[in-house]
Amino acid sequence: MLVNPEPLWLTHTVSIEKQLDTNKWGDPVYDTPIQLSNVRFEHDVTLTGSGNSKTETKGGVVFVFPYIQDSVQFDKSWVDARITDSQGDQFIVKSVITNKQDTTDDVYSWELEVL
């Protein structure tokens, strides 16, 4: 069985809003935000291009552990959800990765990859 991470490592708080639908103009409509405390948000900045035509893409991975966040179960229906970090920056969930325990089918953690 995998060991749960050190709580001192889980220092971030984010809010997540599941996308419900789109309005008549094509804008996303989101559910009520859920606050996730004691998660790990690893930010990533990627630069592409060269010279004066560089593009900066901000993304990252939010690590969620069910032994702390047992009220939410993540699956592919959370793709396109909106995450807001503690600085107010917003990201969109692009994939949900479920990590299982090594000896059982129980969920160890989820990785929410965001852009």
Where would I find each of the regions flagged by the language model?
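Active-site-proximal polar cores
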Residues: 1-28
